[in-house]
Amino acid sequence: MYQSLALAPSPGQTAYADSGAFLHTPGAGSPVFVPPARVPSMLPYLPACEPGPQAPAITAHPGWAQAAAADSSAFGSGSPHAPAAPPPGTTAFPFAHSSPGPGGGTGTRDNGAFQGAMLAREQYPAALGRPVSSSYPTAYPAYMSAEVAPSWTSGPLDGSVLHSLQGLPAGLPGRRAPFAAELLEEFPGEGRECVNCGALSTPLWRRDGTGHYLCNACGLYHKMNGVNRPLVRPQKRLSSSRRAGLCCTNCHTTTTTLWRRNVDGEPVCNACGLYMKLHGVPRPLAMKKESIQTRKRKPKNIAKTKGSSGSSGHTTASPQASVPDPEVSAATLKPEPSLASPSCPGPSVTSQGSAQVDDPLAPSHLEFKFEPEDFALPSAALGQQAGLGGALRQEAWCALALA
């Protein structure tokens, strides 16, 4: 019982199939040595005590395997316990556990397999690296042109390939040799200088007729004017009204708010140019003025606009106040029997709807009918009417005449 437990290894102990110190030789001094006679009686208990993968470690010995085979024949197919050892003639490992000896068949077979593996490795030396003095096989020229292929297979990789490629006259087929100008185009602005002003940087490089480089300003000036751009900066431009050297071709004036050009391209003043544009004929010299007439524009300030409109409203309110209301004038001009003089008959003014004058809701439109007389009104009769002046009488008559 204790011996069977001693045979079971601990969980952290591994079984060595080819170890000579344990369970193989009785004279090895192993502390767990079991005679072969007791092994068959303990084999039924071994599968329950130790894991499955470690069972072949015990049956690896030839003596134990024979004893286990003899004892396992007692178990039939219907036995609930499986035999602990494999059938005779089969081994748990694909290779033999005996060391290869000089005269053993197993050792000879292993030596032959080892030699074959070494020969197979020698046939493919590329996995171990290529020596410096070696050359590539002939399969590479199939991927290259006829000019480059001989240089790759001519000799070892000692730099001769690079020299042969540099010595090719035309280079690779389908590609032309790079030109120096194209290399300079890859770096725009490098080493360029304007031949006119000497500028080294510009947004756009241009060329003149001879192919020299010009900066953008000089190139545009040369393109527009046909001459080289002057290197001296022009002075500040004078105002348009006092531009030096300009004179109107029509009226010979030198002062204007805007200089124009006629159909011939000659400079003219603003007045002559507008007159020619509107009328199609030159402006007469009699219309020339010493002072420039400016346009009277409306004031932009709102406060000034309100003030001017208020003052104009006050000025226009006075004549409106002097104009009498038709109702008032009609009531004033209405003849009363107390004021009428029998000796001096006056013009009789009849009013329709005079009874509606006192009504505030009555319409304000009144219809008057005049009966003209051949005699003039005496001043004494007109002076008796209170509240009427000379101006009021004239305006009242004008209002009645227009009605």
From Swiss-Prot:
Residues 294-303 have a biased composition (Basic residues). GO terms for molecular function: DNA-binding transcription factor activity, RNA polymerase II-specific; RNA polymerase II cis-regulatory region sequence-specific DNA binding; zinc ion binding. PROSITE patterns: GATA_ZN_FINGER_1, GATA_ZN_FINGER_2. Residues 72-82, 90-100 have a biased composition (Low complexity). GO terms for cellular component: chromatin; nucleus. Its main location: nucleus. Keywords: Activator, DNA-binding, Metal-binding, Nucleus, Repeat, Transcription, Transcription regulation, Zinc, Zinc-finger. Residues 72-111, 291-360 are annotated as: Disordered. GO terms for biological process: aortic valve morphogenesis; cardiac muscle tissue development; cell fate commitment; cellular response to BMP stimulus; endocardial cushion fusion; heart induction; intestinal epithelial cell differentiation; negative regulation of cardiac muscle hypertrophy. Pfam families: GATA, GATA-N. A zinc finger (GATA-type) spans 194-218, 248-272. It comes from the Eukaryota. It is found in: Nucleus. Transcription factor required during cardiovascular development. Plays an important role in the transcriptional program(s) that underlies smooth muscle cell diversity. Binds to the functionally important CEF-1 nuclear protein binding site in the cardiac-specific slow/cardiac troponin C transcriptional enhancer. This is Transcription factor GATA-5. The gene is GATA5.
